[in-house]
Amino acid sequence: MDYTTQMDAAKKNVTTKEMEVVAEKEQMEISELKMLMAEGKIVIPANKNHKSLSAEGVGQGLKTKINVNLGISKDCQNVDMEMKKVEIAIAMKAEAIMDLSSFGKTEEFRKKLINMSKAMIGTVPIYDAIGFYDKELKDITAEEMIGVVEKQAKEGVDFMTIHAGINRETAETFKRNKRAMNIVSRGGSLLYAWMELNNKENPFYEYYDKILDICEKYDVTISLGDACRPGCIDDSTDASQITELIKLGELTKRAWDRNVQVMVEGPGHMALNEIQSNMIIEKKLCHGAPFYVLGPIVTDIAPGYDHITSAIGGAVAAASGADFLCYVTPAEHLRLPNIEDMKEGIVASKIAAHAADIAKNVKGARDWDNKMAEARQKLDWKAMFDLSIDPEKAIRYRKESTPEDPDTCTMCGKMCSVRNMNKVMAGKDVNILRED
């Protein structure tokens, strides 16, 4: 192998098998794909040890991808349930799965996940450190934190959230600028607490070059975590968020100098009118690196419905330049999602991603909608179900309320506009009260 990472291969004009897979999926010329990868505007997260991976690209000109979060917590330790979620996420064509397990020894679960998943796998190494070393946060050493990164890289993790932007300088900006909700990033809050408790620099920032060594060796894509993402709409686009984003832009260039692929993570909670400008700011400050957003959630008043608040924000964000959406479920802010929550979150995120791809004029994005329009015009119900983003739900709704005329539905019956236009344009009579 005469290259170290996918980015290195692109810079050397070497075509990898992963590039071939992505180019075919995206209907993009290999030459264009390699050019954008060499510039850092597209990443293909593909750890050398993830053998079951079906590669996906994230970035400029590609379809918007979605990520599904899962994993065990101290209060919910049902590994079998989480593996069932993995199977469903893959069946529903999620392109990425993040193991956010935050309790105990997670290695066995993660290895099983990597072995079975054709979706790219992401993690947040700081979550694993406490359980792996069985130590309180303040007692974990910087070397041990870096050790977790290396351990997970060896296991085959494709991308890792590394909160390297929350350094002492960013922390001071945070202290000087009051927020309604402080730091809501789980990984970011842990690292901020570690810095304060130990009066030391963030290990992920101080030893960033060591992390780059690891990521280059295994071709792990760094997902630069936004520790200072807003946790409510009142905190969005503030000094802490932007200070960290500037730092993430600098860290992006350092990674590129080592041929390490980079994504940048973003908000968060944010009012609709701020989303587009935030996408522009990220692309500018982070030099066109792919943007991975959690939501954004556009209002804070909808517990139980945050898959909707997130889909609204995600559609606007992706239409304005975001490349990767982290799904949000109805259980957000309330509890660990169950399987039904997960399904709803995936569907909502996929709708947002697809709507954005239409707006961005991504190649082939409209084809799906055009086929649905054709099926509806023909009143071809089987085709409509087959084309539905959630066929199971569409079929169930149809069966729950059966119309007299099988061509129609119980909303309009024989007043169905499509039915009647088809008839009259074919020179036939339109009978509403009588049998045809």
From Swiss-Prot:
Q: What is its EC number?
A: 4.1.99.17
Q: In which pathway does it act?
A: Cofactor biosynthesis; thiamine diphosphate biosynthesis
Can you supply a Gene Ontology BP term from the record? thiamine diphosphate biosynthetic process
> Which terms are listed as keywords in the entry?
4Fe-4S, Iron, Iron-sulfur, Lyase, Metal-binding, S-adenosyl-L-methionine, Thiamine biosynthesis, Zinc
Question: Which amino acids does the record list as binding Zn(2+)?
Answer: H269, H333
GO MF annotation terms: 4 iron, 4 sulfur cluster binding; carbon-carbon lyase activity; zinc ion binding
Query: What is the documented function of this protein?
Result: Catalyzes the synthesis of the hydroxymethylpyrimidine phosphate (HMP-P) moiety of thiamine from aminoimidazole ribotide (AIR) in a radical S-adenosyl-L-methionine (SAM)-dependent reaction.
Q: What is the designated name of this protein?
A: Phosphomethylpyrimidine synthase
**Organism listed in the record:** Clostridium acetobutylicum (strain ATCC 824 / DSM 792 / JCM 1419 / IAM 19013 / LMG 5710 / NBRC 13948 / NRRL B-527 / VKM B-1787 / 2291 / W)
| Source species taxonomy | Bacteria, Bacillati, Bacillota, Clostridia, Eubacteriales
